[in-house]
Amino acid sequence: MENEDGYMTLSFKNRCKSKQKSKDFSLYPQYYCLLLIFGCIVILIFIMTGIDLKFWHKKMDFSQNVNVSSLSGHNYLCPNDWLLNEGKCYWFSTSFKTWKESQRDCTQLQAHLLVIQNLDELEFIQNSLKPGHFGWIGLYVTFQGNLWMWIDEHFLVPELFSVIGPTDDRSCAVITGNWVYSEDCSSTFKGICQRDAILTHNGTSGV
């Protein structure tokens, strides 16, 4: 009986240990699932934080150190180092380049050389130019008829201003604080870029 009892006791203990070990292993899948879920949550938080920081960085690029103008209940924003006026942004280059090179630089900034629409805009640009400084604008002479044309393919309205100097099919226009002059397009001057301002309404970007 002792051997039999001893055998039964040992067998019972082994069965208990086996059940306990099996129970312990059965908890591992749940543990790993919880760990996986927690890891996914942490990764998601990092991703959302990165998106949020990127959004605010982009927003700061257009809102920090710039003027904000309100027109008809809307706000207009320009990138850093651009001037804001009547829903448009203006950038005055610091590099001397040809007319075509200046236009190419403006295009890379998602803009174009200045196109003056009215006398108010003309006055704003001339007041913004430093004394003695010249700037390329988006005005050139056509190959036919020696007519002045803007880069948006509209002809210059004589009532807006007159271009001073001789003209030919290689002429482009530069502006100063007082006048607009005809110059050879291969000459080098600083360019004036123009683009539409970013429209916002009630603090929400329109783009």
Swiss-Prot record:
Biological processes per GO annotation: natural killer cell degranulation; positive regulation of cytokine production
Top-level taxon of origin: Eukaryota
CDD domains: CLECT_NK_receptors_like
Gene Ontology cellular component annotations, sorted alphabetically: plasma membrane
Membrane topology classification: Single-pass type II membrane protein
MF term (GO), any: carbohydrate binding
Keyword Cell membrane recorded: yes
Places the protein is found: Cell membrane
Domain C-type lectin positions: 85-194
First-listed, main subcellular location of the protein, grouped into a coarse class: membrane
Glycosylation sites: 67, 202
Keyword Cell membrane: yes
Cytoplasmic topology ranges: 1-30
S-S bonds: 78-89, 106-193, 172-185
Transmembrane segments: 31-51
Modification comment: N-glycosylated.
Topology, Extracellular side: 52-207
Subunit structure: Homodimer; non-disulfide-linked. Interacts with CLEC2A.
Function: C-type lectin-like receptor involved in natural killer cell mediated cytotoxicity and cytokine secretion in keratinocytes via its interaction with CLEC2A. Triggers degranulation in a SYK-dependent manner and stimulates SYK phosphotyrosinylation without recruiting SYK directly.
Protein name: Killer cell lectin-like receptor subfamily F member 2
Protein source organism: Homo sapiens
Lineage: Eukaryota, Metazoa, Chordata, Craniata, Vertebrata
